[in-house]
Amino acid sequence: MRCSLLTPTSYRFHYPNPFRSLESIPPLSNSRYRIESGSPSSFKFSAPSLQRHSSVSVKAFDDDTFDFYTGDIFAATYAISSSEGEESDGDYALNVVTETTAQKLGKFPRGRKKHRIRYGINLGLLAFLSLLLLLMDSFAWKIVRLPLPPYFLSMPFFTSAILVTLAGYIFVPLLDRLRVHEPIRTLGPVPHNRRPTIPTMGGLFFVPIGVVVAIALNKVSSIEVLGAAAATVAFAAIGLIDDSLSLYSENNNGLSAKIQLLLEAAVGTCFAFWLETASLSSPYGMKMLVPLPSPLGLVFLGKLYLLLTSFYFVSMGNLVKATDGLDGLAGGIAALCFVAMAIAVLPICSDLSVFGASMAGACFGFLLHNRYRASVSMGDTGSLALGGALAAMAACSGMFFPLFISSGVAVLEASSVIIQVVYYSTTKRLKGKGRRIFKTIPFHHHLRLNGLKEPMIVTMAYVISSLLSLSAAYIGLISA
């Protein structure tokens, strides 16, 4: 391959060009490269260099370190391409500020981020959710035994998904310009692929859209939907406080764990007492009932129902938060959980089904911006809000068991943290030295240390969550 320096008009700069002539570009002088005597403006790679570039094995799920260069992303770069008239295998970007030789060519940052992971995972998730909701729309009237509008569940899902997708192209650059960036914490040995300047607080734009669409598509004001929306906003406010303190405090620490748990428990307790006094629509004629599969049937919990409600509010918020460690993991799992709950509560409260479908669409729309190589993260503003919304749906309908099943992956993530802490404390007390079961926690980071790539982990989580969501939806339908 013959490589020649480009003309000044071919240079690609990410910042105003600080170079005014070709003479300011450092010469490429190294013993591994041979300059042709007949062409002073071109050079040829030697055999060792070509062998080094041609022998690299690349897989679709491999991490690309070029895409997340942590140096000065505004440094000027220029490209070396093949000779005119030839097709190039790709351009090499040379950083003329930090490097003076072509010996370190493979270590230079590229001019722009190249998405090497296709949309296959997200398209598969969209196909699964769409087919499931369309199937339920065709049989919804048989389940509810009442006439329902066409596309009863599909309409809120696609409406929220489209609106959130479009809103992301406005709010993500705005968050980036306002420097609402996720603080970097080195808490473990796992190198995170997110670049240091990724915007956070994505929940500020996708959670309100999901809530507003759910309320707007309910022609009659539903007290269950309004209560679930209020709980969602309350948990989003807790997450917003935590994110704000993390961004603007000196040590980048948000709310302490105790204060955050107290606030979540307070919201859950208030919601439980509201349930006791509110007149909810129920096919059973009474409240505080938990539908379970036969032979258990309906179980009346009485005052224990209030404690169970508070427990689920605290648990679900932290379960979703625990899964928000990989790009697309929390958003995809939450979307599957919302669809499962939308189907499970359909015989009890069809208005809540619209709320669940709308929130699922909002999660999927956000997922298009939060997929692998994410451009934004939901932050605690989004993760706590999603957990609060799921808990509110379960509390208003009594579908705690289907929610537990559908959130099985999140339960596994949180359980790994609890098991690790308990085992470490016990072994340290008994043997004087603490031991660990997992290499690190949560469990998805343990898998990364064992060699699994991030997209593969997320794909596995989606498949498992899909199966669990189908099981949860079926159990909810046969229990109601």
Curated annotation (Swiss-Prot):
Family, similarity comment: Belongs to the glycosyltransferase 4 family. MraY subfamily.
Cellular compartments per GO CC: membrane
Species annotation: Arabidopsis thaliana (Mouse-ear cress)
UniProt keyword list: Membrane, Transferase, Transmembrane, Transmembrane helix
Gene Ontology molecular function: phospho-N-acetylmuramoyl-pentapeptide-transferase activity
UniProt function note: May be involved in glycosylation events.
InterPro entries given in the database record: Glycosyl_transferase_4, PNAcMuramoyl-5peptid_Trfase, PNAcMuramoyl-5peptid_Trfase_CS
Subcellular compartments: Membrane
Expressing tissues: Predominantly expressed in flowers and siliques (tapetum and ovule inner integument), but also found in roots, stems and leaves.
Topology in membrane: Multi-pass membrane protein
Membrane found in the keyword field: yes
TM helices/strands, residue ranges: 121-141, 155-175, 197-217, 221-241, 255-275, 288-308, 328-348, 349-369, 385-405, 457-477
Major localisation: membrane
Full protein name: Phospho-N-acetylmuramoyl-pentapeptide-transferase homolog
A Pfam family per the record: Glycos_transf_4
Domain of life: Eukaryota
